[in-house]
């Protein structure tokens, strides 16, 4: 088996292929900033690979149900991503359900039906400062994702 660099594509992850989150390598990407559109339930992270020739990329979260980020620099100064993982959402759902905010919330669908929490995924991004971003959303998108082709010999 051999690996060959393919092309760049937009990677879109939802609950059906959420396992891909654990296979995304964002190690050493520089975290440049965050944008939040509250009305659209949309968050975008601007990131940039260390190499100078790489243009900035972005990670976006759509249909955001929940997010939190620490900015304490627990491990000292730093703004590079260490890892991106699929996150267990159980504790956060428990907290929200105790407040009865999610259970009675309506989706943005035409019929205003109750939310289906099974359609949401949890994503956790660690920075080398020790800070962490947690997001629960329906869609996670990474533009300019490098695809590697596998060849059998």
Describe the residue ranges of each PLM region.
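Surface-exposed, interaction-prone regions used to assemble/regulate multi-protein complexes
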Residues: 2-153
């Amino acid at each position: 088996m051999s690996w060959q660099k393919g092309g760049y594509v937009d990677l879109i992850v939802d609950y059906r292929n959420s396992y891909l989150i654990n296979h995304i390598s964002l190690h050493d990407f520089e975290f440049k900033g965050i944008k939040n559109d509250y009305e659209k339930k949309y968050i975008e992270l601007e990131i940039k690979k260390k190499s100078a020739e790489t243009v900035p990329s972005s990670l976006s979260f759509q249909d955001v149900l929940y997010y939190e980020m620490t900015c304490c620099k627990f491990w000292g100064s730093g703004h590079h991503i260490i890892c991106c993982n699929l996150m267990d959402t159980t504790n956060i759902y428990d907290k929200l359900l105790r407040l009865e905010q999610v259970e009675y919330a309506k989706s943005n669908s035409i019929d205003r039906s109750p939310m289906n929490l099974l359609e949401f995924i949890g994503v956790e991004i660690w920075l080398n400062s020790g800070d962490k971003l947690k997001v629960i959303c329906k869609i996670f998108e990474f533009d300019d994702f490098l695809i590697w082709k596998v060849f059998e010999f």
